[in-house]
């Protein structure tokens, strides 16, 4: 027999009816499971109240400082990666790096000086360069352009 949606039933005991409290003298009537007297028996008590214990929101440290909304985060590319991606040399800019899969588009690019160019001559244009990257590119006979 195939199972059909209209044959499905919840497991026995899976669905229980909600207990209505404070309705008559039976179970959960009168005091509705709150005991007698005291602040917890009366109107409302804060969800953050932990019975006099120092609450978690006061035990945790305050977050210090602020987030600078003008901060520029660069995508970094090292010289060794440039030498891998462009072994024949030539023009290298953000568009070429996006096409090569080295960076994502829409964010500024910074070239860092880790690794060696291995004699590859590159004309690199990027938004920022480290000092060591500038030295190594120009020493290999290439040129740099800051965008």
Curated annotation (Swiss-Prot):
Domain of life of the source: Bacteria
Keyword RNA-binding attributed: yes
Stretches the record annotates as Disordered: 1-42
Keyword Kinase: no
Protein family per UniProt: Belongs to the universal ribosomal protein uL15 family.
One Gene Ontology molecular-function label: rRNA binding
Subunit structure: Part of the 50S ribosomal subunit.
GO biological process, one term: translation
PROSITE patterns, A to Z: RIBOSOMAL_L15 (PS00475)
InterPro entries xrefs: Ribosomal_uL15, Ribosomal_uL15/eL18, Ribosomal_uL15/eL18_sf, Ribosomal_uL15_bac-type, Ribosomal_uL15_CS
Recorded GO CC terms: cytosolic large ribosomal subunit
The protein's role, per its UniProt record: Binds to the 23S rRNA.
UniProt protein name: Large ribosomal subunit protein uL15
Alphabetical keyword list: Ribonucleoprotein, Ribosomal protein, RNA-binding, rRNA-binding
């Amino acid at each position: 027999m195939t199972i059909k949606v209209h044959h499905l039933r919840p497991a026995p005991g899976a669905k229980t009816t909600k207990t209505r409290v404070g309705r008559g003298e039976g179970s959960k009537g009168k005091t509705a499971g709150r005991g007698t007297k005291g602040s917890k028996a009366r109107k409302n008590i804060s969800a953050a109240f932990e019975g006099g214990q120092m609450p978690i929101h006061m035990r945790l440290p305050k977050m210090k400082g602020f987030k600078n909304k003008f901060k520029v985060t660069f995508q970094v590319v090292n010289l060794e990666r440039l030498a891998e991606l462009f072994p024949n040399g030539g023009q290298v800019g953000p568009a070429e790096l996006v096409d090569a899969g080295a960076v994502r588009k829409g964010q500024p690019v910074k070239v860092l000086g880790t690794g060696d160019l291995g004699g590859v001559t590159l004309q690199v244009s990027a938004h920022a360069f480290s000092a060591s990257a500038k030295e190594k590119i120009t020493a290999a006979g290439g040129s740099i352009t800051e965008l």
